[in-house]
Amino acid sequence: MTKLLDGLGFVELLDTFGDDLTVVNAARVSFAKESVVMEPKDEKLIKYLADHHHTTPFFHPQLRFRLKMPIYVAREWFRHTVGFARNEVSRRYVDDKPECYLPPPESLRERDANKKQGSKPTPIENATGVHTIIKAFQEQAIATYEALLEQKVAPEVARGVLPQSMYTEFIETGSLSAYARLCALRLDPHAQAEIQAYASAVSKLIEERFPVSWRALIHEAAE
């Protein structure tokens, strides 16, 4: 498990299906061929497939993760739909105490006036004061939520007062190809820093299981 942000967020690899050889044999079936062990020619084939956008062999390997991230990060992550299946904790059914991501003062980045979205790498001038404001707001939101539950308000209604900084947790299964597309976009320097952290953690775990394929895919995406 890789802890992220304030230590409450995480990425955990639960399971994988296949390996680099799975990609090779998915491609070689066109010629009724099969490799038993990885050889240099197989590594060259994987690189060729990635370089020339022959993506279907990379759909066969699958990975399953458990992730915990702030809702506002998750909603960006969930924009990636093709090749993924997700099941998320539902606050219609769960009413335990919420957890929120409280960004440290150095993460309260300044708005970039030259961009429609994004931020400068530098924190705002009054970062410590704003940090205190956010902390107080989160505590009040959670207190209000718990007060609504005490008044017998249904969790599906009471959850409406909770902030986007609240953590959510989900299980996600995706193909190697799908994760390559996701990471290519979310590892970009222009992506939000918080989602870059999750993409980086996922990328490292994938590379450990699919080293040849992942290097080929990420290199191709960076071109």
Task: Give the label of every model feature segment.
Residues 1-223:
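Family-specific signature for flavin-dependent thymidylate synthase
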